[in-house]
């Protein structure tokens, strides 16, 4: 139906933009702020699921700034975005602080239809990706299911009146 068509069009638009998203200031800054909030929580997050939006920036900054991450699952609807992440972090990514190897898994899926098992990640991060989703409560419920008990879901999302001036222009 219409929802599937719109979802497909959004995916195509993301794939067109993914090649230029590496230097996007807004994505970099939003990611920095989300990870700054993550730093306020003094517990380890070894397995992190990154869904949609600033996937490239988030994975890159996790490798640069987190001392505890061991596994990152990069989930995006755009194959081009996932390939860009792989190009940037390489085949054998390591944490910047200690050179510890980090396993990265790549999953191509829509945010509201995650093919991730229940109770497998400590943290779910989504930076500016959930505003694309047709079923936001469903997507958040799917993300919650992937979390271990006492896991953390942390997201930055555009609100209804965000960037009004740009939409009008």
Regions found by a protein language model. Give the residues of each.
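Glycine/Thr-rich phosphate-binding loops of Rossmann-like dinucleotide-binding domains
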Residues: 58, 134, 163
